[in-house]
């Protein structure tokens, strides 16, 4: 697909190529890839929720709700939106990264935010535009915390790195 982010098709193609050695069909390979993305998106939501609440039970419940949301189910099983299904892995990482930066934890901010944003852009660029607009509004609402030297410096560094890592696309 011309002008479409490459990560889903590339990763799915490599998985299919690998599983072809075990006589697994292309259709089954795509289903396995959907399962993997579904499972990892639940794990990422669990991580994000756990870092917010510090309670395993609430983190588990939120990841189950995240996986069972009608939008998530509709994207995978009704629309077969391949790239958007992969995006569900990266959205919790972006949110977690910003939360960690607001708390001054740069150790978690950089990997979460950068991996989340780069993965999001390379999986579904259009949805990441909407995510960026939403985060911009949230950051304007939280302007007292956001417009500080401790936030702006690392945030700009991370944004520049995201742009450099996704510049090829």
Regions found by a protein language model. Give the residues of each.
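Membrane-embedded transmembrane-helix bundle of lipid-linked glycan/lipid transferases
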Residues: 1-169
């Amino acid at each position: 697909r011309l002008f479409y982010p490459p990560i889903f098709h590339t990763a799915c193609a490599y998985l299919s190529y690998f599983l072809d050695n075990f006589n697994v069909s292309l259709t089954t390979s795509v289903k396995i890839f959907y399962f993997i993305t579904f499972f990892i998106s639940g794990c990422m939501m669990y991580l994000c929720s756990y870092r917010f609440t510090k309670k395993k039970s609430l983190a588990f419940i939120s990841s189950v709700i995240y996986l069972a949301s009608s939008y998530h189910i509709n994207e995978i099983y009704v629309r077969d939106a391949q790239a958007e299904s992969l995006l569900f892995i990266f959205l919790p990482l972006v949110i977690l990264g910003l939360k960690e930066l607001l708390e001054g934890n740069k150790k978690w901010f950089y990997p979460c935010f950068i991996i989340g944003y780069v993965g999001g852009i390379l999986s579904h660029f259009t949805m990441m535009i909407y995510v960026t607009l939403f985060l911009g509004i949230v950051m304007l609402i939280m302007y007292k915390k956001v417009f500080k030297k401790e936030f702006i410096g690392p945030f700009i560094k991370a944004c520049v790195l995201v742009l450099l890592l996704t510049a090829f696309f």
